[in-house]
């Protein structure tokens, strides 16, 4: 990829969004209206009395000793799981939180020490998933977010610029799953001439279980069927990294910290201010959280449970209990800073005990069980853990074509692998974009936009139905476009729509 800017890569604090004070996020939260009530749904009767699985059975399936140990531990915890009760939930203590706005005061940066500090860092990108949510069958990291530019290109470009500007060696490590490993290893061949050391490793594979019995889906001595297995979440990174030998290798090379993030989060760049704080305050585990907004529905919130920081995945909560958390505003970005020596010790002492989440996929009309661990749940395992409240700039995930449209528009500018808000846009917020199901896959999305509209002055866009956009279109303010069932709406080339509602008959109304 090519960047036109020649300025030094930015690792200092980015321009902050107006997110308000940290304290203001907790106003009027009533935590104790439903004392002593369980949050999680109960197990099916058969699963509650599931028989143990012999280690020999798992070994016969090809599982490694540390994999089967982790799987057995999770399965046992699932059957005998501890409930979370609302009367134990509290707002995180101020001593467990730090506001990004205050880092330069709490932990001032010594710029003369920047290179030495960066040389202690390893960047790890989580690359286990395919782009299924957008209709792609390849590794999500290989998706284009700009003409000829992929998520992986962005990560490499950013780290390469840091290495050049500071004369350091920050390596890029990619954690793949069995779904992405071979493809990614082929793709990274193109970066051989770049000033970035790239390493990959493959995370564990766990067997699916039947929901009603918790019996294994795959059978020993049969051909491996990928549909009967799954990657057990981002929390598997710690054990898989240890198994790969990379933790010991990096410790021997003088590395002290790892910065973990999702490959599709365009905001997860190296931040020297955060790294400096982690270093000076001797933090073992730092989790970046941000202000939760209306579109944040699938993910985790931060709370204090039994006087420890705790990440709660909303997908695991009974639907009728979700209202308890509607005012919880600390949202997990999955940007995580970890002390390498600390995580190595926890693994060796078998004290890394991550909570899990459960998914119930359907295969051949039968409900399965997948037990997964988010990496952010490690926050409760480390002695000196902290949550860092960061601006939304550091959380730019691309999980849908709606987010892809914003990323590809003139709202943002690409600079050395970083995404920066266009200086010509007033304010710091990005527009709220909701594209209908007709745009849900990348192929359909690309068919429906002859070119990406000008969104520089857009606040809100909703598109529903069979809608096609021409070229050189400008959208401003609030624009709502609805094609009624059986009708098609074509937005002509060169049109400027500002605060308009377009119906299926192409009537244009002021909003």
From Swiss-Prot:
Q: Which GO terms describe its molecular function?
A: metal ion binding; UTP:glucose-1-phosphate uridylyltransferase activity
Enumerate the residues binding Mg(2+). 140, 264
Q: What is its EC number?
A: 2.7.7.9
Q: What are the catalytic residues? A: 399
**Residues the record lists as binding UTP:** 126-129, 140, 203, 233, 264, 399
Q: Name one GO biological process term.
A: culmination involved in sorocarp development
Which biological pathway? Answer: Carbohydrate metabolism; galactose metabolism
Annotated stretches, region: Oligomerization: 460-511
Q: Which domain of life is it from?
A: Eukaryota
Annotated Gene Ontology cellular component terms: cytoplasm
Q: Which InterPro entries match?
A: Nucleotide-diphossugar_trans, UDPGP_fam, UDPGP_trans
The keyword Nucleotidyltransferase belongs to this UniProt entry's keyword annotation: yes
**Gene3D superfamilies annotated for this entry?**
Hexapeptide repeat proteins, Spore Coat Polysaccharide Biosynthesis Protein SpsA, Chain A
Q: Does the keyword Metal-binding apply?
A: yes
EC class name: transferase
Catalysed reaction(s) here are: alpha-D-glucose 1-phosphate + UTP + H(+) = UDP-alpha-D-glucose + diphosphate
Residues bound to substrate: 128-129, 262-264
Q: Per UniProt, which keywords does this protein have?
A: Magnesium, Metal-binding, Nucleotidyltransferase, Transferase
What is the similarity comment for this entry? Belongs to the UDPGP type 1 family.
Q: How does this protein assemble?
A: Homooctamer.
Protein's recorded name: UTP--glucose-1-phosphate uridylyltransferase 1
What species was this sequence derived from? Answer: Dictyostelium discoideum (Social amoeba)
Q: Which gene encodes it?
A: uppA
């Amino acid at each position: 990829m090519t960047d036109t800017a020649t300025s030094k890569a930015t690792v200092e604090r980015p321009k902050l969004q107006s997110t308000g004070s940290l304290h203001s996020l907790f106003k009027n939260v009533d935590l104790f209206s439903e004392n002593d009530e369980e949050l999680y749904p109960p197990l099916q009767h058969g699963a509650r009395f599931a028989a143990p699985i012999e280690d020999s059975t798992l070994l016969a399936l090809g599982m490694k000793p540390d994999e089967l140990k982790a799987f057995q531990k999770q399965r046992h915890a699932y059957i005998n799981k501890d409930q979370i009760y609302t009367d134990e939930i509290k707002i995180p203590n101020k001593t467990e939180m730090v506001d990004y706005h205050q880092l330069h005061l709490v932990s001032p940066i010594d710029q003369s020490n920047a290179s030495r500090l960066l040389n202690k860092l390893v960047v790890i990108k989580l690359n286990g998933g395919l782009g299924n949510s957008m209709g792609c069958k390849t590794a999500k990291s290989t998706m284009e977010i700009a003409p000829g530019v992929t998520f992986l290109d962005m990560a490499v470009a950013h780290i390469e610029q840091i290495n050049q500007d500071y004369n350091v060696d920050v390596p890029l490590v990619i954690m793949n799953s069995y779904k992405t490993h071979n493809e990614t290893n082929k793709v990274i061949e193109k970066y051989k001439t770049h000033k970035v050391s790239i390493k990959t490793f493959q995370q564990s594979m766990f067997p699916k279980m039947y929901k009603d019995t918790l019996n294994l889906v795959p059978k020993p001595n049969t051909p491996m069927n990928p549909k009967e297995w799954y990657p057990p979440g981002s929390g598997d990174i710690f054990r898989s990294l240890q198994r790969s030998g990379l933790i010991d290798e990096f410790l021997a090379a003088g590395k002290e910290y790892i910065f973990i993030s999702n490959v599709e989060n365009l905001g997860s760049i190296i931040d020297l201010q955060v790294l400096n704080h982690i270093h000076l305050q001797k933090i073992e585990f730092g989790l970046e959280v941000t202000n939760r907004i209306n579109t944040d529905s699938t993910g985790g919130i931060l709370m204090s449970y039994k006087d420890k920081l705790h990440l709660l995945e909303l997908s695991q909560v009974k639907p009728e209990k979700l209202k308890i958390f509607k005012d919880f505003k600390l949202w997990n970005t999955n940007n995580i800073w970890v002390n390498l020596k600390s995580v190595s010790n926890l693994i060796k002492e078998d004290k890394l005990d991550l909570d899990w989440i459960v998914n119930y996929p359907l295969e051949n009309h039968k409900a399965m069980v997948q037990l997964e661990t988010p990496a952010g749940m490690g926050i409760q395992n480390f002695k000196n853990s902290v949550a860092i409240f960061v601006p939304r700039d550091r959380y730019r995930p691309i999980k849908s074509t709606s987010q892809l449209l914003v990323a590809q528009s003139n709202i943002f500018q690409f600079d050395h692998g970083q995404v920066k808000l266009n200086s010509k846009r007033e304010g710091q917020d990005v527009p709220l974009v909701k594209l209908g199901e007709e745009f849900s896959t990348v192929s359909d999305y690309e068919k429906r936009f002859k070119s990406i509209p000008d969104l520089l002055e857009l606040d809100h866009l909703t598109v529903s139905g069979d809608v096609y956009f021409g070229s050189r279109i400008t959208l401003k303010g609030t624009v709502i476009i609805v094609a009624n069932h059986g009708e098609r709406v074509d937005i002509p080339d060169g049109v400027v729509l500002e605060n308009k509602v377009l119906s299926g008959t192409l009537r244009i109304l002021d909003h």
